[in-house]
Amino acid sequence: MSTANALGDLLSTLLLRRPFKRGGSKEGSISKLCLSLLSEVTEVSGLQLAGVILEKYHELDEKGRLDFFSFLNKDLDIDPDLLVSLAQKYQETQSPEIFKRLSEASEPRRKELFRRLNHAPGATADLVKMREQLLSLLRENPSYARTDFDFIHLLRSWFNRGFLVLRQITWDTSASILEKIVEYEAVHEIKNLEDLRRRVLPKDRRCFAFFHPSMPDDPLIFVEVALTNGVATSIQKVLSESREEIDLQGANSAIFYSISNCQEGLSGISFGNSLIKQVAQDLSREMPHLKTFVTLSPIPGLTKWIKDEGLEKPVEDQGMLKQITAHYLVEAKGKNRRPIDPVAKFHLGNGAIIHQINIDADLSEKGLLQSKGVMVNYLYDLSKISQNVELFSKEGDNSANTTIKALSRQAGRNIMQKGNAKEFSQ
């Protein structure tokens, strides 16, 4: 890996906190303890109090957590009357002192509470878990989104790319981390240890993960890569138990066939963009003969869209299925002119283009249900990523090669001529 990653590993080691036993008095409600922490002026006593609060939080039942989040949301919110008053005074005076008070008043106190809680050993992982539990309550308690806004603002800062450490996952990686890889795999289930071995041990198979120094044994996101001769068109072949390992000198393509986010509490914070680009760059340096970097991606919204558009009959023909899939990926967009397919939205937004559509590429039960077995390759051209990101951001352009665009146009002509479907969603 690169020098930056080596330094990151060193940073990870240096930042590992010494064992610390959380202690101190647990007297008083958790809300009172939080108020005490906010008024604490000495770092040592604040550190212990933060640990006590996190311990107390772990002991809360469902009702206790609801009460705690209600306290954060209401009692530690901004004071709008004070804010308006200070804004008016600042407008009149432009006073630096008023500006300082206005800035302080505009930040909810819960934000400073999260910062102080994070001083305790192991607190970062605790706060990520806390946000995960908060997210589970948002549907029935939409006002808690105010607290979540502050949470995610801080987490984005704490988990910015500069703090992340890229590590390769191998068969020699610690058992605890390998167990988490099995647990977190979200795209293609790892069925047993032998299945895991086939994904990380052979020289033509790689797995890379981002870690954070405060959570050194728990991956944030990981990607699985197959090094192949030619673009892979089927997940069955990639994961085949009987496949033969290839000589790395004969590999010209890197296939990103699975990417899994690991922490629900970090939902909304994107690591995938940086991970794919970093891995592609590192592999390119290690093996200059690798010329093609593509994904082998699911199309989770395809079957539903086909049904909604009344296209079940036409897609019984495989040629039509390929055309209609191309049309879905290129033209099916939401009100914001972004793809309605979440995987397409992710990769196109990261600078990839739609490269190739593969029929019968995922014959698992999940693959057949969500996309009638179709998968797609998104191409990452390292020299054009920035250009593609800009086009997608400004124009919502669903970048695709000429073959895909031709398939999409043909789908429109065929279906409309036969009158077999509603007008395609645009």
Annotate each PLM feature.
Residues M1-Q426:
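Extended, composition-driven regions rather than compact fold-specific motifs
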